[in-house]
């Protein structure tokens, strides 16, 4: 299917350009030349000899044959002799040849070592085995690995064979893998829902297969639980939805004192939710949020520092700050909170 503008070009396909140019007058040809110059000022499509316009309107005074001119210039160049050098080149070398200086070879002179008479007598009367043991203590490995010394010890009286340099290493202590977390997830969840007084600490660390809905149920059950004081879910693949659920729990819970969510997949959004929830919590004294999959960023760290400066109950905060400013502010805030606790304890002891 032809486009509308293509249909209009069909009639120009069979036009003879030479016939059209032959019908144009000199003025029309000049106008056409000016139009072409405007379209292509550099005349990149023309040979170099035709790009410049004629600078005069005068007629030529004689015939011009380009081939004849080139032949004449080539003939003149071959017939003209080269100019001789004013100073002919003789190949003579001038100056001195560079010879690098040889560095003197340093020869080491062995120093004569004089021993005490008692040591000389002891070494003179020592057996080969004693000398071998002494070399091992002093670290003289050349003597220990010398085959000539082995032959001498073999030929000695009372020796059954050569003494080899066998160094016995210490036995490697077996490093056993940590046993899996023995916590029964379902049983702990049911105890929390039943508000069991015997359950005061829940440790779910390193249990990788806990579903996200189950972790949310733990957070939901903590809202009404009045006995659990320490809850830890480090390295459980928890993410932002879990962090948001625990943030809602912190706004309601009045018993929990320690929360650990380290080594998880929580981003800055989840951490900020937990930090904001601490403004409405009066019982939590310890929270750990370090070693997440991605860095929290400067903005989140500044929010954490501002919250801790306004919170007088957090005594332990587990996070390694990347910036000096928030780190200094948080350290000062935690120190201030611990000083307040110490002052209250001292005042209570005085009473």
UniProtKB/Swiss-Prot annotation:
Q: List UniProt keywords, sorted A-Z.
A: Actin-binding, Cytoplasm, Cytoskeleton, Phosphoprotein
**GO terms (BP aspect):** learning or memory; neuron-neuron synaptic transmission; pointed-end actin filament capping; positive regulation of G protein-coupled receptor signaling pathway
Q: Where in the cell is it found?
A: Cytoplasm, Cytoskeleton
One term of GO molecular function: tropomyosin binding
Give one Pfam family: Tropomodulin
Q: Where Phosphoserine occurs along the chain? A: 25
Keyword Coiled coil attributed: no
**What's the superkingdom here?**
Eukaryota
Q: What tissue specificity is annotated for this entry?
A: Neuronal-tissue specific.
Gene3D superfamilies in UniProt: Ribonuclease Inhibitor
Q: Which GO terms describe its cellular component?
A: cytoplasm; cytoskeleton; synapse
InterPro entries (alphabetical): LRR_dom_sf (IPR032675), TMOD (IPR004934)
Q: What does this protein do?
A: Blocks the elongation and depolymerization of the actin filaments at the pointed end. The Tmod/TM complex contributes to the formation of the short actin protofilament, which in turn defines the geometry of the membrane skeleton.
Protein family: Belongs to the tropomodulin family.
What do we know about how this protein assembles, alone or with others?
Answer: Binds to the N-terminus of tropomyosin and to actin.
Name of this protein: Tropomodulin-2
Give the gene symbol: Tmod2
């Amino acid at each position: 299917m032809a486009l509308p503008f293509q249909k209009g070009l069909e009639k120009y396909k069979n036009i003879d350009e030479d016939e059209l140019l032959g019908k144009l007058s000199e003025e029309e040809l000049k106008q056409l030349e000016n139009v072409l110059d405007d379209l292509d000022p550099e005349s990149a499509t023309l040979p170099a000899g035709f790009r410049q316009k004629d600078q005069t309107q005068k007629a030529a005074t004689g015939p011009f044959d380009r081939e004849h001119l080139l032949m004449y210039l080539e003939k003149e160049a071959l017939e003209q002799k080269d100019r001789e050098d004013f100073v002919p080149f003789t190949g003579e070398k001038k100056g001195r040849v560079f010879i690098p200086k040889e560095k003197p070879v340093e020869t080491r002179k062995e120093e004569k070592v004089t021993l005490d008479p008692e040591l000389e007598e002891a070494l003179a009367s020592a057996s080969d085995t004693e000398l071998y043991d002494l070399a091992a203590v002093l670290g003289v490995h050349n003597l220990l690995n010398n085959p000539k010394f082995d032959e001498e010890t073999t030929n000695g009286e009372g020796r059954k064979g050569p003494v080899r340099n066998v160094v016995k290493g210490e036995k490697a202590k077996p490093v056993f893998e940590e046993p899996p977390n023995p916590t029964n997830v379902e049983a702990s969840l049911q105890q929390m829902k039943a508000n069991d007084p015997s359950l005061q600490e829940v440790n779910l660390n390193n249990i990788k297969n806990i579903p996200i809905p189950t972790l949310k149920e733990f957070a939901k059950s903590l809202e009404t639980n009045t006995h659990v004081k320490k809850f830890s879910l480090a390295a459980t693949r928890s993410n932002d939805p879990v962090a948001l659920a625990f943030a809602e729990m912190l706004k309601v819970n009045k018993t929990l004192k320690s929360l650990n969510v380290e080594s998880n997949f929580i981003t800055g959004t989840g951490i900020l939710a937990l930090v904001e929830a601490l403004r409405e919590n009066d019982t939590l004294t310890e929270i750990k949020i370090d070693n997440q999959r991605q860095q929290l960023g400067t903005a989140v760290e500044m929010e954490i520092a501002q919250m801790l400066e306004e919170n007088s109950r957090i005594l332990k905060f587990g996070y390694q700050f990347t910036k000096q400013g928030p780190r200094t502010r948080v350290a000062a805030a935690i120190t201030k909170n611990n000083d307040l606790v110490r002052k209250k304890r001292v005042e209570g002891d005085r009473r």
